[in-house]
């Protein structure tokens, strides 16, 4: 499942057969290349930066040994993805709830301890976003940057999550769509807002004075400035976040790859080996290069999917209306009453 399949099938149903297969292939090729950026090199790079931070920073033994960390991480990932979607699901289903809950609790604790700065932080977000200078000169640039980082945060519009949701066994695809709608809310509205408040109420001013603070290092310093003991737990969670994201994107990329050349154990093995190589590569290059590469790949991946969303919008609306009618009529029973 995923965009390459619903683009091909959906466009045929919309009498656009001549465009169906090319758009499916366009998306498949985009997700194969795109998974190497946002879901691979960027994640391994940030995991390595966090590992260096907790092992001494610039004085760390590993500061110039990204290759070593990269190959170790690639080896661990390889052990999991060899098991396919079941192995990936087994690991991520245990990691993600634990990581999310722990991170939210830690962020709330930092915000509460700096509660006196929260009104200023919220005011700064609103005033800096909508002041006249921002809306004139820098508005377009900031909007572009915002869209790029939002895509990193929740993958909305990219279509990657649809590949994972397609593996779910359900008789009602619409209900699975509702589950998918919760993901951007949790990622962006909850997690990212909390992270922004943590940074703004702790290390915002020093970070602005030193342009070298960016990425995961900025968040780490924000937490450690209030909770000195949080460095190791947060670093562990950040590395696990990167690890689980890499696992998920390995599956997305493999499905795009097999869509292009067909299902076979050799095809999947070749992709998995190549994917693991890029994990190591991501640890060896600087963050700005990874970000530029990833931003370009996100844009390319989103093009065919967003096109498909607009073209197939009437189909989605029809399915939603039909689902709501059956739900309200009682035809769809979500819960069974237990016998007395």
Predicted regions and their residues:
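Helix-loop-helix module between adjacent transmembrane segments
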Residues: 8-45, 51-73, 77-80, 237-246, ...
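Select transmembrane alpha-helical segments in multipass membrane proteins
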Residues: 16-33, 69-72, 133-153, 190, ...
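C-terminal membrane-solvent junction of multi-pass transporters and transport-like membrane proteins
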Residues: 12-23, 238, 242-280, 311-340
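Extracellular/periplasmic helix-exit of transmembrane alpha-helices
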Residues: 107-124, 135-137, 167-168, 182, ...
């Amino acid at each position: 499942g995923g965009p390459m399949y619903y683009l091909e099938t959906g466009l045929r149903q919309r009498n656009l057969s001549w465009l169906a297969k090319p758009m499916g292939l366009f998306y498949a090729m985009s997700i194969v290349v795109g998974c190497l950026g946002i879901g691979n090199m960027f994640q391994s790079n940030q995991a390595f930066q966090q590992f260096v931070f907790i092992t001494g920073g610039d004085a760390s033994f590993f500061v110039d040994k990204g290759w070593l960390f990269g190959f170790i991480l690639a080896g661990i990932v390889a052990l999991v993805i060899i098991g396919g979607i079941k192995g990936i699901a087994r690991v991520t289903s245990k990691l993600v709830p634990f990581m999310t809950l722990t991170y939210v609790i830690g962020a709330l604790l930092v915000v509460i301890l700096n509660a006196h700065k929260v009104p200023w932080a919220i005011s700064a977000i609103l005033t800096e976003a909508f002041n006249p200078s921002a809306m004139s000169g820098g508005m377009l640039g900031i909007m572009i940057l915002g869209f790029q980082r939002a895509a990193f945060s929740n993958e909305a519009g990219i279509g990657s999550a649809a590949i994972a949701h397609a593996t779910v066994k359900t008789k009602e695809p619409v209900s699975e769509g509702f589950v998918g709608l919760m993901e951007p809310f949790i990622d962006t509205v909850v997690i990212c807002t909390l992270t922004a408040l943590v940074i703004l109420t702790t290390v915002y001013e020093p970070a602005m004075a030193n342009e070298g603070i960016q990425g995961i290092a900025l968040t780490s310093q924000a937490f450690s400035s209030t909770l000195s003991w949080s460095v190791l737990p947060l670093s562990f969670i950040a590395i696990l976040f990167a690890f689980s994201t890499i696992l998920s994107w390995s599956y997305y990329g493999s499905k795009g790859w097999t869509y292009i050349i067909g299902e076979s154990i050799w095809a999947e093995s070749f992709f998995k080996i190549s994917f693991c190589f890029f994990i190591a590569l991501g640890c060896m290059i600087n963050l700005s290069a990874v970000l530029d590469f990833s931003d370009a790949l996100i844009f390319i991946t989103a093009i065919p999917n967003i096109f498909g969303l607009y073209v197939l919008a009437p189909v989605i609306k029809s399915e939603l209306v039909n689902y709501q009618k059956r739900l309200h009529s009682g035809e769809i029973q979500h819960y069974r009453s237990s016998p007395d």
